[in-house]
């Protein structure tokens, strides 16, 4: 089978990772002890993608939990599915990264990285045919961002032909933990542009807005935000976990979604949006699902897709529904909004349907868009970065760990280049390809 090895790094990465395992274990009928209690063969048909079958018929997640301090991992271990993980796969330091990317990437994290790679190697060796790795982390802290990107580049060295996917939580001024988040995020994006194949940008600002506006939660907690993240992660991995034809592995998804290697930052969306513990009374119709999942309010990245154009889109519908109706509605969306899809990639919207809906819903839809509007998110981080960097504010925390200012300057310009590339393809039309060829050569040099 085509296995995926999951890594969660840092506080945020471990919290959303733990929620991800709770949600998909439930969908596959696996209880907190790793025992199967399901009612459908579909639940087990591709269980090997994310789980190892251990002795006594127990299913163990192919998960590695990493942090530079023990706190979050202790709470994962004490949490509802804490006992399902393999105890040897908890790898943690004691010092913490103090929200400092340099500590995660160059000093504290670098000391721990070899013991993490040993565990990753062991997991990879138990795979029959490893398709790739997925990492959950945030870009604003120290461990998930600094050590997370260090792990990515080390894994890239050792497994250059395997797919690397990240679920990256991008910082936002509305839900901010520390003032240096723009530094950590820019340094991380600098790494992700070069070293990942697919990055799902999950944005705290968008999650906060969804909780506040759509779900009417007056005071959203991280628990509420993480509920949305886990629903989205469950949705985008549906094709990988259940039998189906379309985007059934990470590589096929990448081939469909990434027209240019650097432009692999996706905007996820989900419909219907529900709050934690709520039951939905009325199943949405296929037209409603389709309309909602393309709606800017349902995007997990704080960017408005109407400010850009879609290069590619993947949609995953879940539940019992008419395939014909799904196809009609998806065509309908494209025809009505054709100006928002680039015309120089024909058939750039792909749709998959899976019979098994998520818990508590009759039908749901998950949206993955590669939109040029994602540049808004990088622009936002870049502006905050520049404001501090031009005064060299807080830089001593980074140079004190051995970093050079030059690395900041490079990261800043790489992110600004990324923004310009998105802009370039947003403005492109089918006719004027001649001009691009020359640009391309300059960039390669």
Swiss-Prot record:
Residues 429-445 have a biased composition (Acidic residues). Residues 424-445 are annotated as: Disordered. It holds the Pfam family Tubulin. GO terms for molecular function: GTP binding; GTPase activity; metal ion binding; structural constituent of cytoskeleton. CDD domains: beta_tubulin. It comes from the Eukaryota. Belongs to the tubulin family. GO terms for biological process: microtubule-based process. PANTHER family: TUBULIN (PTHR11588). One of its GO terms (cellular component) is cytoplasm. Its main location: cytoplasm. Dimer of alpha and beta chains. A typical microtubule is a hollow water-filled tube with an outer diameter of 25 nm and an inner diameter of 15 nM. Alpha-beta heterodimers associate head-to-tail to form protofilaments running lengthwise along the microtubule wall with the beta-tubulin subunit facing the microtubule plus end conferring a structural polarity. Microtubules usually have 13 protofilaments but different protofilament numbers can be found in some organisms and specialized cells. PROSITE patterns: TUBULIN, TUBULIN_B_AUTOREG. It is found in: Cytoplasm, Cytoskeleton. Keywords: Cytoplasm, Cytoskeleton, GTP-binding, Magnesium, Metal-binding, Microtubule, Nucleotide-binding. Tubulin is the major constituent of microtubules, a cylinder consisting of laterally associated linear protofilaments composed of alpha- and beta-tubulin heterodimers. Microtubules grow by the addition of GTP-tubulin dimers to the microtubule end, where a stabilizing cap forms. Below the cap, tubulin dimers are in GDP-bound state, owing to GTPase activity of alpha-tubulin. This is Tubulin beta-2 chain. It comes from Echinococcus multilocularis (Fox tapeworm). GTP binds at residues 11, 69, 138, 142-144, 204, 226. Its cofactor is Mg(2+). Mg(2+) binds at residue 69.
């Amino acid at each position: 089978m085509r296995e995926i090895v999951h890594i969660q790094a840092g506080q945020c990465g471990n919290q959303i990772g733990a929620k991800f395992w709770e949600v998909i274990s439930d969908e596959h009928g696996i209880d907190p002890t790793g025992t199967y209690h399901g009612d459908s063969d579909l639940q087990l048909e591709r269980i090997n993608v994310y789980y190892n079958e251990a002795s006594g018929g127990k299913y163990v997640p192919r998960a590695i939990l990493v942090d530079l301090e023990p706190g979050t991992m202790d709470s994962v271990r004490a949490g509802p599915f804490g006992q399902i993980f393999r105890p040897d796969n908890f790898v943690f330091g004691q010092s913490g990264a103090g929200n400092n990317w340099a500590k995660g990437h160059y000093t504290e994290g670098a000391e721990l990285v070899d013991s993490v790679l040993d565990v990753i190697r062991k997991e990879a060796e138990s795979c029959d045919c490893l398709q790739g790795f997925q990492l959950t982390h945030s870009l604003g802290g120290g461990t998930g961002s600094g050590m997370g990107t260090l792990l990515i580049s080390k894994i890239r060295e050792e497994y250059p032909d395997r797919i690397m996917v990240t679920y990256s939580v991008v910082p936002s001024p509305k839900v901010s933990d520390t003032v240096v988040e723009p530094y950590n995020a820019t340094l991380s994006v600098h790494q992700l542009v070069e070293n990942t194949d697919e990055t799902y940008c999950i944005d705290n600002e968008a999650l906060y807005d969804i909780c506040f506006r759509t779900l009417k939660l007056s005071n959203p907690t991280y628990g509420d935000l993480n509920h949305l993240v886990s629903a989205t992660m469950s949705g985008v991995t549906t094709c990988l976990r259940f039998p189906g034809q379309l985007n059934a592995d990470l590589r096929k998804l990448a081939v469909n979604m990434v027209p240019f290697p650097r432009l692999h930052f996706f905007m996820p969306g989900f419909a219907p949006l529900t709050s934690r513990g709520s039951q939905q009374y009325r199943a949405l119709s296929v037209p409603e699902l389709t309309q909602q999942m393309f709606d800017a309010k349902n995007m997990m990245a704080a960017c408005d897709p109407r400010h850009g154009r879609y290069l590619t889109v993947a949609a995953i519908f879940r539940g019992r529904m008419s395939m014909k109706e799904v196809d009609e509605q998806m065509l309908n969306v494209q025809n009505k909004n054709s100006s928002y899809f680039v015309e120089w990639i024909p058939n750039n919207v792909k749709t998959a349907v899976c019979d098994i809906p998520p818990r508590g819903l009759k039908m749901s839809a998950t949206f993955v868009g590669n939109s040029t509007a994602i540049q808004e998110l990088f622009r936002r981080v870049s502006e905050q970065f520049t404001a501090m960097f031009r005064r060299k504010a807080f830089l001593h925390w980074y140079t004190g760990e051995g970093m050079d200012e030059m690395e900041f300057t490079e990261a800043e310009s790489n992110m600004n280049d990324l923004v310009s590339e998105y802009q370039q393809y947003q403005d492109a039309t089918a006719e004027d390809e001649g001009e691009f060829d020359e640009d391309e050569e300059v960039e390669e040099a």
